[in-house]
From Swiss-Prot:
InterPro entries: ATP_synth_F0_asu, ATP_synth_F0_asu_AS, ATP_synth_F0_asu_bact/mt, F0_ATP_A_sf. It is a multi-pass membrane protein. One of its GO terms (cellular component) is plasma membrane. F-type ATPases have 2 components, CF(1) - the catalytic core - and CF(0) - the membrane proton channel. CF(1) has five subunits: alpha(3), beta(3), gamma(1), delta(1), epsilon(1). CF(0) has three main subunits: a(1), b(2) and c(9-12). The alpha and beta chains form an alternating ring which encloses part of the gamma chain. CF(1) is attached to CF(0) by a central stalk formed by the gamma and epsilon chains, while a peripheral stalk is formed by the delta and b chains. The lineage of its organism: Bacteria, Bacillati, Actinomycetota, Actinomycetes, Frankiales. This is ATP synthase subunit a.
Length: 284
């Protein structure tokens, strides 16, 4: 890289992610603006909404075309993630999980679409908003399933039967994990993966553009080949990151819903009386 820099090669700069404002509008103390990152985020949201609206506006008993695609996506999220992770009660959260998966996937895939070539999720603001919505939702699910008192009580005292010093140690860990670490890691994981992947793709793409016209051409060809391979790999990462954030969201919702449920200990199960007519030897 230093040799290339001395010869005039310029790698990715901060302007790649700090896209210039197309226009600014000041309303009092509020400054509204539109740039490439914001436009792509709005496009992704509208694209997802329009696709599902077109797919279900004239639903038929035997789905075809776009309706078949939308129903397949819904069934996948509902069966594999909502019910598979949360349980039967997870169906009520399927619409949110479906929209989350679809929106993140489109935002990610825009990184390799000509004309866009920018993943909106590589701006930390987008993953932070998604994590905030998930944060509110899984806490709401926990409060609705268990009640506010039991939900926060177990968060403060997750092991009531443990010795006092363990309870004191676990309380801040549980509170930090639920209220701070989960939304933070959810946002940073998506942001960091998309940011790093886009930087890597840009380095080899710009390298190929710089080296191809110059002999020896083998270096330019190698850089171009790596860029093509990374583009294909980026598509896999795009889908994988959308899946990961969706399944983690489902796991957080499911964990919050069972928060505070009492599990029967083996000793309690053995101590319970056997049903009438069952021999004592059959209790074990």
């Amino acid at each position: 890289m230093p040799v290339l820099a001395d010869e005039g090669f310029e790698g990715p700069t901060k302007e790649v992610f700090q896209t210039p404002h197309w226009f600014d509008v000041g309303i009092g103390s509020v400054n509204l603006y539109l740039n490439k990152a914001t436009a792509l985020t709005i496009f992704a949201a509208l694209f997802v909404g329009v696709i599902f609206w077109l797919g279900f506006r004239r639903a038929k008993i035997i789905p075809r075309g776009l309706q078949n695609l939308c129903e397949s996506a819904y069934d996948f999220i509902d069966l594999q993630i909502a019910r598979g992770v949360i349980g039967e009660k997870g169906t009520r959260y399927t619409p949110y999980l479906l929209v989350l998966f679809s929106f993140v996937l489109i935002c990610n895939v825009l990184a390799v679409v000509p004309g866009a070539q920018f993943p909106a999720t590589s701006r930390i603001a987008v993953p932070m908003v998604l994590a905030l919505v998930t944060y509110v939702l899984f806490n709401y699910a926990g409060i609705k399933a268990n009640g506010a008192g039991p939900y926060f009580k177990e968060m403060i005292d997750p092991a009531p039967t443990a010795p006092l010093w363990i309870r004191v140690l676990l309380a801040p860990i549980e509170i930090l994990s639920t209220l701070i670490v989960r939304p933070f890691t959810l946002a940073v994981r998506l942001f960091a993966n998309m940011f790093a992947g886009h930087i890597l793709l840009l380095v080899f793409s710009l390298g190929a553009d710089y080296l191809l016209p110059k002999p020896p051409y083998v270096f330019g060809a190698a850089s171009l080949l790596v860029a093509i391979i990374l583009t294909a790999f980026e598509l896999v990462i795009d889908a994988l990151q959308a899946y990961i954030i969706t399944i983690l969201t489902a796991a957080y919702i499911g964990g919050a819903m069972v928060h505070g449920e009492h599990e029967v200990a083996p000793s309690e199960e053995l101590a319970s009386p056997a049903p009438a007519g069952v021999p004592v030897s059959a209790r074990a």
